[in-house]
């Protein structure tokens, strides 16, 4: 799994240096988000169109032939609309259990989605529906890396 903030760099650099090499990999699960300064501070935030990135990936021959998947992260209605428009997977990084159940309901109505329903977890909530659990091993913010690992593996 690789999650990318589409606004962290210039669009051409994003395609050439990040996305194109990732699309060479087989069975890569790519996540896209637009980022904000809520969890990680950025010196510069670009205003890239996430739909341009989605279309670039979905039309890429390697994405198709390598059996890769694509999901969107975020809780906004605009992100959920993109999931439905492009038939993508959904990930929840932060947010409430009720937000995740709402995402499950949206995902459940997709026909042959191009990604999975997933949640980055630090707790042991059990749901009766199937979803991919993503354990965060490294956060891009190195300052909180150790704290994140401690929170993932602590016994509540």
Predicted segment positions?
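Active-site-adjacent structural elements that line small-molecule/cofactor binding pockets in enzymes
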Residues: 1-156
């Amino acid at each position: 799994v690789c999650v990318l903030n589409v606004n962290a760099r210039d669009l051409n650099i994003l395609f050439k240096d990040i996305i194109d090499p990732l699309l060479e990999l087989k069975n890569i699960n790519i996540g896209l988000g637009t980022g904000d300064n809520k969890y990680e501070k950025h010196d510069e935030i670009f205003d890239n169109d996430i739909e341009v990135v989605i279309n670039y990936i979905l039309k890429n021959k390697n994405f198709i032939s390598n059996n890769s998947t694509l999901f969107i992260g975020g809780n906004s209605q605009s992100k959920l609309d993109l999931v439905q428009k492009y038939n993508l997977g959904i990930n929840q990084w932060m947010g409430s259990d009720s937000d995740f159940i709402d995402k499950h309901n949206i995902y459940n109505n997709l026909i042959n989605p191009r990604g999975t329903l997933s949640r980055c977890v630090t707790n042991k909530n059990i749901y009766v529906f199937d979803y991919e659990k993503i354990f965060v091993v490294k956060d891009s913010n190195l300052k909180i890396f150790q704290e994140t690992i401690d929170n993932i593996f602590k016994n509540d």
